């Protein structure tokens, strides 16, 4: 599930690598479209690929439940896996796009690895923080609240990075 959401998000980022080979990076500067519209299209493409990954992950979960029953310990496990996948993807996109425009296309792969590791680290850090804030046997409501906090932080970083880029 995580691989579907994160993997499909990587598709939109990987497509930026091909810009220099196709000379699009030079051509887009001469078009009558504003730079902000081009940047917003990258963010929108990223979100669309994330949604495609979520759909594939949802289909995978549904098929798994239909064929094997419910393989998770708690009802919230699927929710948390989706929150982690979406959170890592949004953090990754929120970090990658500003780095890409600051550093240029030459270091695209390096920025991709950095943003992926930062996304994973931020989700793990938030999870650790939430585990220390809530008492040890977490209730279902606390788990859902923790997931909502992770999602809200990831979405905030992603939304803030769009105008910054």
What do the PLM-derived regions correspond to, one by one?
Residues 1-23, 41-165:
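Hydrophobic alpha-helical transmembrane segments of membrane proteins
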Residues 29-35:
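Short helix-to-coil transition segments within interhelical loops
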Residues 37-39:
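Alpha-helix N-cap/helix-start motif at helix boundaries, enriched for small hydrophobics
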């Amino acid at each position: 599930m995580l691989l579907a959401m994160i993997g499909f998000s990587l598709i939109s980022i990987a497509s930026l690598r091909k810009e220099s080979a196709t000379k699009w990076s030079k051509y887009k500067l001469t078009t009558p479209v504003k730079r902000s519209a081009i940047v917003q299209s990258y963010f929108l493409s990223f979100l669309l690929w994330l949604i495609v990954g979520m759909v594939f992950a949802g289909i995978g979960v549904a098929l798994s439940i239909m064929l094997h029953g419910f393989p998770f310990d708690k009802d919230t496990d699927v929710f948390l896996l989706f929150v982690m996948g979406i959170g890592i993807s949004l953090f990754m996109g929120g970090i990658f796009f500003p780095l890409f425009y600051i550093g240029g296309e030459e270091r695209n792969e390096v920025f991709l690895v950095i943003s992926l590791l930062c996304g994973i680290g931020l989700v793990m850090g938030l999870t650790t923080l939430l585990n220390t804030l809530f008492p040890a046997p977490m209730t279902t409501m606390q788990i859902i609240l923790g997931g909502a906090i992770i999602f809200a932080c990831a979405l905030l970083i992603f939304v803030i990075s769009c105008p910054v880029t």
